[in-house]
Amino acid sequence: MRLVKPKKALGQHFLKDLQIAQRIADTLDTFKSLPVLEIGPGMGVLTQFLLEAGHDLTVVELDMESVDYLNQNFPDLKGRIIAEDFLKLDLSKLFPGQFCVIGNYPYNISSQIFFKVLDYKDQIPCCSGMLQKEVAERLAAGPGSKTYGILSVLLQAWYDVEYLFTVSEKVFDPPPKVKSAVLKMTRNDRKELGCDEKLFKTVVKTSFNQRRKTLRNSMKPLLGKDCPDYALPIFDKRPEQLSMEQFVELTLISQKHLEKQAGDVL
């Protein structure tokens, strides 16, 4: 059986440990009624456990060598291998209803994968898998943590994020230079934020662009130098001190100011 050569340009680190693959597959045990999309299956170490568990599985794999391997070794995947870039897929065309996402995510695009999951949050009730330990810690971090950032806030607005366990670099081929971790995100019951969602994203991103400064300084690119709301106590804080609810409050303050500013121009 010819094995696939890992490609550095694609961020490929193939998982070798079957026990860990089984534990990752088990994170979707409560979602067996929904279709599953696996990102970056490589040589199918995780794939085999998802199929054994009876999941309605589709995989997306950019590496044609891996696609050939999967076609040869996983007959159950016939017609279910998408040889494309996950980041460019229109997922709503693939899945008209809800579906779950799982994978041993390519390390070079893991953050981009989660931003895309957010775009389909109403269709994706659960997303789990393996990524760099540092990124997993950042996604699961709470207010007050040095690792709390843009993705932490945006994901936790819509998902309960669980850091499940750490994985040694020794269980991969080739071994990455960093440790990995398994993360699980389960959609919370929030239907809306209570503010404009697009502006919420802009506010979060703007505030963290200068994370060491107080919001009074970091929000100037959006609100200008002389916003009268800077007198409010919330602007004394740094972005990592704010909860998701406080970011909603900050968004409402920003929206009011920007609408007034637009009205003054007219």
Swiss-Prot record:
One of its GO terms (cellular component) is cytosol. It is found in: Cytoplasm. This is Ribosomal RNA small subunit methyltransferase A. The gene is rsmA. Pfam families: RrnaAD. Its EC number is 2.1.1.182. Keywords: Cytoplasm, Methyltransferase, RNA-binding, rRNA processing, S-adenosyl-L-methionine, Transferase. It comes from Parabacteroides distasonis (strain ATCC 8503 / DSM 20701 / CIP 104284 / JCM 5825 / NCTC 11152). The keyword Cytoplasm applies. SUPFAM superfamilies: S-adenosyl-L-methionine-dependent methyltransferases. PANTHER family: DIMETHYLADENOSINE TRANSFERASE, DIMETHYLADENOSINE TRANSFERASE-RELATED.
